Amino acid sequence: WFRDVPGMNVSLPIPITLQRQSNSNRYVFNDTVDPTFKNLGGFFPINGQLYGNYSNTGKNFHFTYVIDTEFVYEAGQGHVFTFTGDDDVWVFVDGKLVIDLGGVHSAVSQTIELDRCNWLQSGKTYSLKFFFAERHTTKSNFRIETTLNLRNVAPPGATALSD
C-alpha cells in the first residue's frame, strides 16, 4: 500500500503544514481549517488526480498517505502526538508501533505520551513514521496535534523511474 508498485499504484508528494498554536508549544494540522482542504469537505488530497475519483462523487476516497519525520526526544517535557481521523492509521516511533487505529471506522483519536516510551533517551534523535489509509466512501477526517518539533526528512533517492 505505501510504496510505488509499477502498474498497481502511483504517488505524488502532498505537503501539509502543522501550524503552531498561539501561546503554546502545540502544532496542529486540521483538514477542517487548513486553507488547502477546508473547502473540500474533508482530507481529500488527490481529488481528480492519479487513478481518479470514486463513482461520480467528485471525491477520491481511496488513497494512502505517509509522513516520514524525526524529532529530538526531551525527557520530562510532556511531549505528545495525537491523531484524530477515520480509517486506518499506524504511527511508529523508532520502529515501534505506538498508535494503532486500524480498520474502517468513523473519526476517533489516539494519543501517545512520549514519556511513557521507556526506550527513548533524552537528547537523541528518533524517527516518527505515520501511515494513513483512506478506504471508506463517506468521509475523510485528518487532524494531527503534537508538541514535538518534527523535522523534515529527505525522501530516499531513486536509481530508476521505479525501484
Where are these regions (language model features)?
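Acidic/polar, compositionally biased interaction segments
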Residues: W1-D163
